[in-house]
Amino acid sequence: MLCALAVAVAFASSPGRAATPEPGTATAADEGFARDMAVHHQQAVEMSFLARDNTADEEVRTLAFDVINTQANQRGMMLGWLDTWQAPKISVDGAMAWMEGHGGGMAPTDMPGMATREQVDRLKNTKGADAEVLYLQLMIPHHQGGVAMAEAAVKQARNPQVKALAEGIVRAQQSEIDLMTSMLGRRGATPTPASPGPAPSAPAPSAHH
């Protein structure tokens, strides 16, 4: 199942590699999604390296390896888009300013599904079966947050490569959520509640870059 999922994820990310967006073709939503999702992916990669190193379970290690490869590749692609668009990699308005229903101004750690530094440190210091369960319990809400961000980008983004990547992220990460929930169940554990995230505020401006 993991191999099939990896193929699906690779296919989902291929539209972004097939064509490079041209300078000046990005809206605030295109840029904001690429910027924030790159940060979101960075934490998923970090936690997956910790899980890979802290457990000998092949199923969890294979999942972690797939997350590392897929999300590191997508992160590099999104940072490359920002370079092409001559857009900053850090927003002066804070994270999530592009997403309707959020006013921005928040720290990257406040993005949907992001683990706290304390949770990441706990994963770093946890080994074996406990590390497997903790990794899955952190990654499920992390993926749920990523899906919410990608669904917003599907609606708000205007660049076709950005929309294609966002659509692929929704499909792939939802599949991984289902897989990780099943993996937790086989380990006698359940997902932890997803963070509700910050309260909505005024819609983000729709000005173009």
Residue spans for each PLM region:
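All-alpha RGS (Regulator of G-protein Signaling) helical domain and cognate RGS-like helical scaffolds
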Residues: 2-209
